[in-house]
Amino acid sequence: MKALTPWLEEKFPEYAFNFIQGFNTMDYYRDLLNRAEQLPDIITCRRFSLNDAAPLAEHLMDLSTTEVAGTFYSSYLNNNQEPDGAIRWLPMCAEVDGTAANVDLFAQYNIPLPTNYAEFVAAINAFEAVGIKGYQADWRYDYTCLETMQGSAIPELMSLEGTTWRRNYESETEDGSTGLDDVVWPKVFEKYEQFLKDVRVQPGDDRLELNPIAKPFYARQTAMIRTTAGIADVMPDQYGFNASILPYFGETANDSWLLTYPMCQAAVSNTVAQDEAKLAAVLKVLEAVYSAEGQSKMAGGAAVLSYNKEINITSSTSLEQVADIISANHLYMRLASTEIFRISEDVGHKMITGEYDAKAAYDAFNEQLVTPRADPEAEVLFTQNTAYSIDMTDHGSAAASSLMNALRATYDASIAVGYSPLVSTSIYCGEYSKQQILWVMAGNYAVSQGEYIGAELRQMMEWLVNVKDNGANPIRHRNYMPVTSGMEYKVTEYEQGKFRLEELTINGAPLDDTATYTVFVAGTDVWIENEVYCNCPMP
């Protein structure tokens, strides 16, 4: 989003944008509605399934008859089609998940790049014979378990029986649940069990994270790893070897598929339709977002594919090996509901450790799928007595100020500095569970604390407010205005969207440049180290 949002502001200067960083789950939006809050005009979510999104349906517009919906290949949009034909979610450009192969290593050992599953296994065995790990994956993560499990059996999942089961699962109601079928899913687990054996998983592999598998690959000690095309694309420049993305192989080349997932899905609140001018503006923005240029901005230079007709937004060298698969539209969109992620991790790890064979894995997966699960994070932790709005006013966001006050008190600091996007929702009166507290915080932020003199604190605030000599503007929109606790500041907007720091005060008295203060800082490395700050990181 970091390239898309300023592009939209520049493209549509007549519109006032307010970007809110939310949480990567449909439950986040459900919680907003449960508190009788209004959804933003356009909402997005990366981890998506129609199953998870169903409770939001009555609050979202049907986009099936819009011009932007007509730009999609119907085969991909059908994944988001509700039983009555409504389409409320549109998929953004696709990230490609697969196997990155060190092409130079294959050439060095005269091992052919595989074109089907048997050749894939033969390549693994050939590398193992010369002391090189054939294949490795970061099995620790839920997405790796989910993607390799589904990837190993895409032909079955894309069969008539497989797509019928998926449609039934995606359209289930809160009053009922859909278990695994007895035709497709037993084969999925049989193929996954064989896949795990063929790639030679070892005890302890279920704990492998990204860095421990990436370093041997970069050092030419591993021939293939699970990764994305975006990561594979940077390998020639960063690590000095050529890498190609390989698909999830079938028995023949014609049975091979690329596993994909949208960078996010977008929907529109049905309150937008009540205002003709706003509706026209939102549809205009959506058309821009799903244009070739918009999706390129969304991708931010990463290798992606488009689900839209006649849009080619990648020139990725890592995807050249799978050009025929892309041309054949063999792009499988992963099934990615919250429960599928969770269960795939649990069952996948137990298959890796040998606790489950294919039959036991099928039974355990099915049991978890149909058994209601108590949420351990739903316990009420405290009750909030005062509500604060997230809306930006002339004095900033009251919700963000409230959070910074709480953080300053928690960490016993004299001054705290952060950003409005630290807060993803208004703070409301009522009970808070652990999960709801996490939703208030928009993400995992870098925090630091130390002793600084007033002059250093003044320099920090100048970095975060003032436009630089090269024109870089840290306050690209008002949401990026610093939020402080224990210290007040005044700025002058000398030109629209450009600010100058005028004064800093503590309890009404000027900041003492020679005094020492305990300062707590919360932000993200992306903002702190971005070139708009002239590479001046927060102290």
Q: Residue locations for each model-derived region?
A:
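Feature captures C-terminal
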Residues: 396-539
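Long, aromatic- and glycine/proline-rich binding clefts that accommodate carbohydrate-like moieties
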Residues: 297-350
